């Protein structure tokens, strides 16, 4: 095992562009050591394969370009990965909806235990991952011959997307599943940046009192070029749709600036944003737990503070 180290990273993409989380996942692969290959499964996705070939440190790109993979349905994608898995000691994907859907199926097919949401590589078989909503970090060691791992993208700096020139090798479709078929998708359109990609995020909690009041955040977000997020309490109360949700059961974000407004700071919310570079909290309750992680705190009524903030921008 020790003399055979080779990692396959499953690229996340939309058939035209590689998603940034794949570059963070590659950083984890580099930390493991050994050779690193990328698998692109899609349809009419040569552009993605070309982009992958240019990524720094990638030795080879495997391209499965077939109509069967147009929507990267998890059943077929897992079967495809299994067909090449014997060549690799480690198989990694970002811990996104995509990675969390595909890799557990692969783990079952390979009969190994998946290691989820790693935040650090200690050695080729030992990793750190958060548990209990991020309040503890577990160090786990795997004895499986093939290590199947999802990577928390925010914990790793992305590798450079240029400087490489890897060969691209075609892979044939394998055991395409008819268990599921793609019916359609509804994508929320927004002029604001996507939550996990934004460098500034402003989030509202139960203290916002209504969905209408989120316009106070939106005005500020548009002045700052920020994304708008929310706590689970705000989502459960119906103030905003659940794609706004930041936290353990929502999106994990680590922007340069995170502004928490009317959010008390339950541990599940902190799990989703505590790695942000600078955290600013506005809350009228001076005992709110959010102030314990905030770099800057303002004890104030948000309905006074937000208009003032907006006017000063």
Segments and roles (model prediction):
Residues 1-313:
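N-terminal glycine-rich FAD/FM-binding segment characteristic of electron-transfer flavoproteins
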């Amino acid at each position: 095992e020790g003399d055979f180290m080779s990692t396959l990273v499953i690229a996340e993409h939309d058939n035209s562009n590689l998603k940034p989380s794949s570059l963070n996942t590659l950083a984890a692969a580099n930390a493991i050591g050994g050779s690193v290959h990328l698998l692109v499964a899609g349809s009419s996705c040569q552009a993605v394969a070309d982009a992958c070939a240019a990524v720094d440190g990638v030795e080879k790109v495997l391209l499965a370009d077939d109509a069967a993979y147009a929507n990267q349905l998890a059943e077929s994608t897992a079967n495809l990965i299994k067909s090449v898995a014997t060549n690799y000691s480690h198989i990694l994907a970002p811990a996104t909806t995509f990675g969390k859907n595909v890799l557990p199926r692969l783990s079952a097919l390979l009969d190994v235990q998946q290691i989820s949401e790693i935040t650090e590589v200690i050695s080729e078989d030992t990793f750190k991952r958060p548990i209990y909503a991020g309040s503890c970090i577990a160090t786990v060691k795997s004895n499986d011959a093939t290590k199947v791992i999802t990577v928390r993208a925010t914990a790793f700096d992305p590798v450079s997307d240029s400087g490489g020139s890897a060969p691209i090798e075609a892979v044939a479709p394998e055991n395409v599943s008819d268990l599921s078929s793609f019916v359609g998708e509804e994508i929320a359109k927004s002029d604001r940046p996507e939550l996990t990609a934004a460098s500034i995020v402003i989030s509202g909690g139960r203290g916002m009192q209504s969905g209408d009041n989120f316009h106070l955040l939106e005005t500020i977000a548009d002045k700052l070029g920020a994304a708008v997020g929310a706590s689970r309490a705000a989502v459960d109360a119906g103030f905003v749709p659940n794609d706004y949700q930041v936290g353990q059961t929502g999106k994990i974000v680590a922007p340069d600036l995170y502004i928490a407004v009317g959010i008390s700071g339950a541990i599940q919310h902190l799990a989703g944003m505590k790695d942000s570079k600078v955290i600013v909290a506005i809350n009228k309750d001076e005992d709110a737990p959010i102030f314990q992680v905030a770099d800057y705190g303002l004890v104030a009524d948000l309905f006074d503070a937000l208009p003032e903030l907006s006017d000063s921008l």
